[in-house]
Amino acid sequence: MERKINVYLNRWKRDVSKKVLVIYGNKQVGKTYSVLKFGEKEYKNVVYFNADNNIELLNTLKREKTMEKIIMHLSLLSNESILTNDTLVVIDNVNDLEIINAMKIFGKTQELNYHIILITSLRENLKKFKCEELQFKAMNSVDFEEYLVAINNKQLIDFIKTSFKNNTPMPFHSVAMDYYDDYLMTGGLPEAVEMSINNSNKYLLNTIYSKVSDTYKKEIGTLDTLIDITRGLEVYDSIPYQLQKQNRKFQYGLIKAGSRSKDYEKSINF
């Protein structure tokens, strides 16, 4: 699937002043898939690390303080050569900020010849890092324009943009709305978009929704240093009921009887 992030990644690769790139966003929006596809297309080889519970990787990055030693040990850990300008190093599922912190050393060189991308679903804790040390790029779910490209309807995009630019009626408005309804059914999830294109049975999307929901719940379970896990899960489970109401104000009583704002404020803000 063609994603807008691809344009950014190609520009990043060719930027002589590039830094280590941190791509962040919700789980299941296509971060890893897009980065690996980019790597396969643009580099001689891709060296991939899954940082989730990877103690050896974490210890290496905490211990080594120079670019050369970090690269050498990453090469040893992966049993692959890391070539300047020809290898893409991908560190996925970065949940430990010490990994990101270790990458700041690469930002001290004028021209970075090692191409490194970190992928994380963390957002809030990234604010402490400076842009001169690292590059950050948010990646969101599939938007409506990307969806229309995926279903091979670029012409409709042109009609919409022209009508918007000229402030004129869109000649295929009802057609666009039908496609928009189909898009909303996917939730902007790449896997759901692919399934909706290749299978007319919309009920199969429920399996993807359930899988993604379970993934989010699992992630909430790892955030014990940031929020109360039990209350975080209660807030998450109440979202469908909150959205069904005519009144758009968040109602704490829908979480459970007797709920108060001060008990859930931290979880809701997160």
What annotation goes with each model-predicted range?
Residues I105-F106, R123-F136, V149-N153:
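Short regulatory helix/loop adjacent to the ATP-binding pocket of P-loop NTPases
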Residues E80-I99:
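Conserved P-loop NTPase "ATPase switch" module shared by AAA+ and STAND
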Residues S34, F38:
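Hydrophobic positions on the alpha1 helix immediately C-terminal to the Walker A/P-loop
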